[in-house]
A protein has these predicted regions:
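Adenylate-forming
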Residues: 1-4, 8-27, 33-42, 50-57, ...
Length: 245
C-alpha cells in the first residue's frame, strides 16, 4: 500500500510506439528510406568468406564461440589512434574489422550489421523497453587506402547511418526487397558490436554494494545467427571480445 519512491515517468513505452508510428511516415519516412536506398544500391548480396565447407542450401545455425582479450597497451593505442583521427573507438574497430573481412573475402565492398541503442531522445533514456535497431554499415575498402582515409570513410558511413537510424530493420528489408535465399541472411551476414554500457566497464560493481561482487560468465548455446559476429567490450581499461561463427 506504499507509494512508489521512484519518480513519475515522462512517457511509457506504449507512448513511444504510438509516437514512432505517427512520426515515421510521409516526408520523414521517405527521406529516411531514400538515404538507405542510395546507400545500399548495388550492395553485394553475400560476403563470400573462405570456408572449409560449402555453404549449405539452408542455414543450420550451428556455431561456436572464440574468446580473446587485447592487452592494455594495444587498447590504449587504439584509443589514441581514434582521438588523433577524430573518430570513436567503435569506428576504429569497425574499420579494422571491415578491412580484415575485405582481405579474407577479396571483396572491396563490405557490408556489416551493427545494433544501435536507438534511444535518441532524453525521455526514453531511463525507460525499460526494447528500442534496439540494426544498422547496415557499407564501406568501400578499395585501393591503397591509408589508415586515416579508411577511418574517415568509416566515420562518414557511421554518421550517415546514425542520422537515419529510425527506420526499423524489418521495414528496410521490406522496402529494399533484397534477394532472399535460405542459405544466408538478407543485407548482411557479418555483425559487429562494441558494448559501452556501465556494466561492461565494471562501473556497476563500484558502489553497488560492498558485499556484492558482479562478474561476467561466458555462455555458449552452440548456435550462430550469422556467419560471423564480433562482439567487443571494454572491461577495466582492456578490450575483450568473442567471435561467434
Amino acid at each position: 500500500g506504499q507509494e512508489s519512491p521512484l519518480p513519475e515517468l515522462p512517457i511509457q513505452y506504449a507512448d513511444y510506439a504510438v509516437w514512432q508510428r505517427q512520426w515515421l511516415q510521409g516526408e520523414v519516412l521517405e527521406e529516411q528510406l531514400g538515404y538507405w536506398r542510395e546507400q545500399l544500391a548495388g550492395a553485394p548480396a553475400v560476403l563470400e568468406l573462405p570456408t572449409d565447407h560449402a555453404r549449405p542450401a539452408q542455414q543450420r545455425h550451428r556455431g561456436a564461440l572464440l574468446s580473446f582479450q587485447l592487452s592494455e597497451a594495444v587498447t590504449e593505442g587504439l584509443k589514441q589512434l581514434s582521438r588523433g583521427e577524430g573518430v570513436t573507438l567503435f569506428m576504429t574497430l569497425l574499420a579494422g574489422w571491415q578491412l580484415l573481412l575485405a582481405r579474407y573475402s577479396r571483396q572491396a565492398d563490405v557490408v556489416v550489421g551493427s545494433p544501435v541503442a536507438n534511444r535518441t531522445r532524453s525521455e526514453v533514456e531511463g525507460l525499460i523497453g526494447f528500442f534496439v535497431n540494426t544498422l547496415v554499415l557499407r564501406t568501400e575498402v578499395a585501393g591503397e587506402l591509408r589508415v586515416g582515409e579508411l577511418l574517415q570513410r568509416v566515420r562518414e558511413v557511421c554518421l550517415g547511418a546514425y542520422a537515419h537510424q529510425e527506420v526499423p530493420f524489418e521495414m528496410l528489408v521490406e522496402e529494399l526487397q533484397p534477394e532472399r535465399n535460405m542459405s544466408h541472411t538478407p543485407l548482411f551476414q557479418v555483425m559487429f558490436t562494441l558494448q559501452t554500457t556501465a556494466t561492461t566497464r565494471g562501473a556497476a560493481t563500484a558502489g553497488a554494494s560492498q558485499n556484492l561482487t558482479v562478474g561476467q560468465m561466458g555462455t555458449s548455446s552452440g548456435t550462430a545467427k550469422f556467419d560471423l559476429v564480433l562482439e567487443t567490450s571494454e572491461v577495466q581499461g582492456v578490450l575483450t571480445g568473442q567471435v561467434e561463427y
